[in-house]
Design a protein with these regions (language model features):
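Phosphopantetheine-attachment site and its flanking helix in carrier
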Residues: 49-59
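STAS-like cytosolic regulatory interaction modules
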Residues: 1-50, 63-97
Length: 97
């Protein structure tokens, strides 16, 4: 689930393959309505569990943000996501805040 807070979009719950399509679509919706000047921060501090699909969702959001000319950052990624990114060799591509 994604909720808008004062300074970020707060992602909560699991980021697993079962919900990946919905999370991708929800995030894209927020990105499409975002201000180019302000950009978007996805706060992952409330994410409970991840699998490799979480990285796919993040990179999908990033492609959408780039296409729209909106800046995007990821804050507070869970350790499991950082480990998966390192395993797949994509750590440097994560837009960490």
């Amino acid at each position: 689930m994604i909720e808008k807070s004062d300074s970020a979009l707060r992602v909560s719950g699991p980021m697993l393959i079962a919900g990946a399509t919905g999370l991708l679509a929800s995030g894209r919706g927020f990105l499409s309505s975002a201000s180019r000047a302000d950009g978007v921060v996805f706060d992952l501090s409330a994410v409970e569990e991840t699998d490799s699909s979480a990285l796919s969702v993040i990179f999908g959001w990033l492609r959408t943000a780039q296409a729209l000319g909106v800046g995007m950052r990821i804050a507070n990624p869970p350790a499991s996501m950082i480990s998966q990114a390192a395993l797949y060799g994509v750590s440097d591509s994560l837009p960490l805040a």
